[in-house]
Amino acid sequence: NKIICKLSVREKDKKMKTSSEYLKEANALVEKIDVEVGIDRHKSGKAIFIDVRDSADIASTGTIKGSLQIPRGFIEFAADESTPFYNKALSKDQEIILVCGAGGLAALTGKTMIEMGYKNVKNVGGIGDWIKAEGPVEK
């Protein structure tokens, strides 16, 4: 039994992913756009912007003007039409541009949304770069 137990633990360890591996997969799947491109898309009014940071972070820096605030930990519910938490502003065919603190959470969120059937999801990176580039912000 000890041998079987040790083998099971080793097999399990082989399948575990690190946060770096998750992020690498997300960055490979979700298109990263420059902040200038994001600002142009914002001006066009054709994209949905989502800030995936928590409310405390958003309160301290502000967010992209007109963006939805859907925390990373809630996106699976807000993006799923079958839940009572579905955000009706979301559309699987519309361009969705995600922002977070530095780009990592936006990438992970984008991967999740793509896996849920959203077809045009992009990552504009961190809010600091957006503010520095003088993109429209609201508090």
Where are these predicted regions, by residue range?
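Rhodanese-like catalytic fold shared by cysteine-dependent sulfurtransferases
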Residues: 13-47, 55-95, 104-139
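Short, Lys/Arg-enriched N-terminal segments with co-localized hydrophobic residues
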Residues: 1-15
